[in-house]
């Protein structure tokens, strides 16, 4: 996989559930944050796009939870992108930084709505 963007983050204690691992919903926050940072690096902003009448929305997600992250783990969120018709397909993989173990592979399809 050829990634075009990556960012490092840390697991915060409030993101973990009773088992001491990251709650599944937080992986979606991590991938969304990565997309926001990527677009910002490209000179784009979701807020500015919205003001111009363009809303990028998630159309589909294919997710796998492979290896759980735990409190204080540092991880790397990597992103690849391809255009497929009217959708943008983001391949987003999360790796534990200490050993590069794949924790969460995901494919997220984004479509843009124009003026509603």
What kind of feature is each model-predicted range?
Residues 3, 65, 70-71, 81-116:
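HotDog/MaoC-like acyl-thioester-processing domains
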Residues 39, 43, 75, 91, ...:
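Short linear functional motifs in flexible/disordered or boundary regions
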Residues 1-58, 114-116:
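Hot-dog-fold acyl-thioester-processing enzymes
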Residues 52-55, 59, 63-81:
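Helix-adjacent hinge/juxtasegments
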Residues 26-30, 47-50, 77, 82, ...:
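Short, low-complexity, polar/charged sequence segments that are solvent-exposed and flexible
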Residues 15, 62, 109:
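Short aromatic/hydrophobic contact patches that present stacked aromatics
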Residues 1-6, 60, 74-76, 87-89:
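Intrinsic-disorder/low-complexity, polar/charged segments enriched in Ser/Thr/Lys/Arg/Asp/Glu/Gln
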């Amino acid at each position: 996989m050829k990634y075009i963007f990556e960012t490092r983050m840390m697991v915060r204690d409030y993101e973990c559930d009773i088992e001491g691992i990251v709650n599944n919903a937080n992986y979606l926050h991590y991938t969304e944050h990565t997309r926001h940072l990527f677009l910002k690096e490209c000179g784009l902003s979701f807020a500015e796009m919205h003001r111009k009448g363009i809303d990028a929305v998630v159309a589909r997600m294919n997710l796998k939870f492979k290896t759980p992250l735990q409190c204080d783990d540092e991880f790397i969120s990597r992103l690849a992108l391809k255009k497929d018709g009217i959708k943008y397909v983001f391949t987003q993989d999360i790796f534990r930084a200490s050993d590069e173990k794949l924790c969460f592979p995901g494919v997220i399809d984004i479509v843009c709505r124009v003026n509603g």
